[in-house]
Amino acid sequence: MTLRMLFAFALLAAAPAQAQQTEPQPAEEGGLSGTVSDDSEWQDLGIAIPAFATNADVPTPTSAGSTSALGQALAQVISANLRNNGLFKPVGPESLPRPGFEQVQAPDFAVWSARSAEMLVQGYVRANGDGQLTVGCYLYDVALKQQLEKAGWTVAPADWRRAAHKCADMIYARLSGESPFFDSRVAYIAESGPKDRRMKRLAIMDSDGANHRYLTSGQATALTPRFSPDYKSILYLSYLNGRPRIYVYDLAANTQRLVTETPGPTFAPRWSPDGKWILYSMATAGNTDIYKVPASGGASQRLTDTPGIDVGGSFSPDGSRIVFESDRSGSQQIYVMNADGSDHRRISFFGGRAATPEWSPRGDQIAFTHIVGNLRIAVVSPGGGDLRYLTDSWQDEAPTWSPNGRIIQFFRTEKGSGKASVWQVDLTGRNERRLSTPGDASDPAWGPLLP
């Protein structure tokens, strides 16, 4: 939902199978470790990622093809994951020699040292007799001639990309000292059709933009999705039956239920970090306020009661505070309050308007849309200081954080055409890229790491 749509609406109303871990087990801690504090510290770290080996090249029921082709595809996904996060510049798998199956755990370090590789990622893929796939992943320090990490997973053929994401997560966590984020999913709104008759469907995809799946038919407009903390459901706004209300979509059962019966239109839903509460805004008698209701059902509690429009809400990671937007001062601005609705405090005093705030999983920053002519993605501390812009386009809005709080996804609307697409940017603001989607896309919502 665009900012204009959200506030206009309020004014008018006054809106999977798990991967099983298998051998090899992770190695003991040792070798390279550290914490990324500066982008340049790791930017030139040479990570070689050749195609994964296989014990036998046999057909698989995957989109990649045989186990040999799948080994190439696994390395490509891992390399792309690490390249696109802004910390590393991996090389391969193209132009690199593929190791033999027997070399995966006994690399020729001299070969890789001659290629100026500092780190080496090798692995294998094996087709099992039960139809499953086993993927092994190994991280080596070339100079030390030492294995740093190893892990393996047994996955269904349809989930082969999850094994690649998990391998990238293992590498990222070891080399950066930070929590990983690749093995996660994004809920978003898939858009199609002309501007005056736009179809908006609830959809999900992998964090890198692969494996798209539509969840709703598009007969009713869907907006502002949010994954539950346990990944079992998605909270979203729908115009099902012609009235804007909040629903929970059950991903296993492919069913949806109404969150609560209310006298006025409801919109801008959000989960609490523990999944026990749902925040929402409701417009009644010319006023819009924020409420919370037990996720299991029950009576709603009103959290704001001021003249004007109070919209949205994002919990701090510990669930003790809520950041939200309000026009009580005359324009959209960002406020923070306690989770019980007490102690409201404005934190945006930097000119223009501020909207769609989202608390970082780390708790140290709040991402939001800053509106001064154009719409830009920015971050600020919970106290309102340290303002930084991450994008500089015509209309960027609705930021959502990666599980580790290092990457932000948002959607960008093209001037003139009105076409929307999902983009991501790291906290330096220098590593920006568009995610590929089958059609137009908006309202991204990044979920936590998959279990």
From Swiss-Prot:
Comp. bias (Low complexity): 18-29
Compartmental location: Periplasm
Record carries keyword Lipid biosynthesis: no
Keywords, ordered alphabetically: Cell cycle, Cell division, Periplasm, Signal
GO terms of biological process kind: cell division; protein import
Location of the region described as Disordered in the Swiss-Prot/TrEMBL record: 18-37, 431-451
SUPFAM superfamilies given in the database record: TolB, N-terminal domain, Tricorn protease N-terminal domain
Subunit structure: The Tol-Pal system is composed of five core proteins: the inner membrane proteins TolA, TolQ and TolR, the periplasmic protein TolB and the outer membrane protein Pal. They form a network linking the inner and outer membranes and the peptidoglycan layer.
UniProt name for this protein: Tol-Pal system protein TolB 1
Organism: Novosphingobium aromaticivorans (strain ATCC 700278 / DSM 12444 / CCUG 56034 / CIP 105152 / NBRC 16084 / F199)
